UniProtKB/Swiss-Prot annotation:
PANTHER family reported for this sequence: ARGININOSUCCINATE LYASE
GO annotation terms (biological process): arginine biosynthetic process via ornithine; L-arginine biosynthetic process
Gene that encodes it: argH2
Protein localization: Cytoplasm
The organism of origin for this protein: Shouchella clausii (strain KSM-K16)
Key word Amino-acid biosynthesis present: yes
Stretches assigned to coiled coil: none
Family: Belongs to the lyase 1 family. Argininosuccinate lyase subfamily.
Gene3D superfamilies from the UniProt entry: Fumarase/aspartase (C-terminal domain), Fumarase/aspartase (Central domain), Fumarase/aspartase (N-terminal domain)
Alphabetized NCBIfam families for the sequence: argH (TIGR00838)
Catalytic reaction equation(s): 2-(N(omega)-L-arginino)succinate = fumarate + L-arginine
Name of this protein: Argininosuccinate lyase 2
Listed EC numbers: 4.3.2.1
Enzyme class: lyase
Residues spanning the membrane: none
Amino acid sequence: MSKLWGGRFTKTAEQWVDEFGASIGFDQQLVEEDITGSIAHVTMLAKQHILSEEEAAQIKNGLKTLQKKAAAGELVFSAAQEDIHLNLEKLLIDEIGPVGGKLHTGRSRNDQVATDMHLYLRTQTEEIMEAIRTLQAALVKQAEGHVETLIPGYTHLQRAQPVSFAHHLLAYFWMLERDYGRLQDSLKRVNISPLGAGALAGTTFPIDRAYTAELLHFEGIYENSLDAVSDRDFIVEFLAASATLMMHLSRLCEELILWSAQEFQFIEIDDAFATGSSIMPQKKNPDMAELIRGKTGRVYGSLFSLLTTLKGLPLAYNKDMQEDKEGMFDTVKTVKGSLRIFAGMIETITVNTDAMAKAVTSDFSNATELADYLATKGMPFREAHEVVGKLVLTAIEKGVYLLDLPIEVYKEASSLFADDIYEVLQPKTVVGRRNSAGGTGFEQVKLALGKANDLLSQSIKG
């Protein structure tokens, strides 16, 4: 089969060479964007009298026919035509005749593919942002029922201080809010049109780049034709934001996995998001959480792969840049799938409040409260820290917890202790008193829930 660019060649490549160089196996995912960009381009060509209205109408009708066939899954692509652009151009010529060959006037595949990816990423980024909001809503809904449910807070995976379970869940809400913001900000770079930049130097045809940008709902155009076709930083930025998002999901997955283990029993993951064992009948494995944790590495890999591909490329377009798409497609699929699974998983977890309550009363996570108690009575905090450390050691030696020590032991340690110390040491008192801004105190958690709900409401209205 002859190539659309084959005029200067005297021989054709072997089929296996064509297959190695072809990208149609994956860039056919850009079929809708490619047709949309082409319709805008040919509309502009007619407006600028580069093509006649009749020619433009023929081409647009042909493109819309291909669009319908694509939606119905009726288009057949060929590796011999390399990519989605040449495949569609060949199919268009087959559909409407030689006039289809005028579509590419004033355009290169270099600005064409860049336009496709800008259109694709704009849509996908907006859909991922919506999915983040859905997960955030699930976290808020779960948190609203557990403002006064207490869970051990950890540092170094050692119990540190008790916190509200709602406060813990909302930590991820705010991480996701920053992820949302990063993606939202990236749209400023995505929503710029490279169409009309040509191969690298622009074109001699009197095209109107601003008009095609307007037709495609871009906010502006690339100001430099070399830049427009040479860089993929907008994809790098998307991949970096996605990698950060997946890192946050992976961390919460790790906690869900730990919390669902027999050693914790803080939560139970719904059967719909777990699997069993082929040999051990008792097993219930948190597979979906583990898969999201594992798939995080795929997204990291896509980011590092593209950065490595781009780092040594001279301007302008190089065939290496064909490698920019598969990682992008895979990341979009991975992130969207992970967010969808996660929202369902969070909505349906069963919280074992009894296990959590038992955990916060069978440790020394209220020790900081003792030190704060002494500090509020005038003892320097560093001295208070040492006094409480010795009380913890005494309790460990006696095989009890701080609430179990008799008042005499406290008064022997410091005359500042009084009978009210036992109320101070109660887990709900410990948590409830931490009402500094952003703290785990119940009033602060309720305020945080209000702010979170306001953000979600604004997104719905927007």
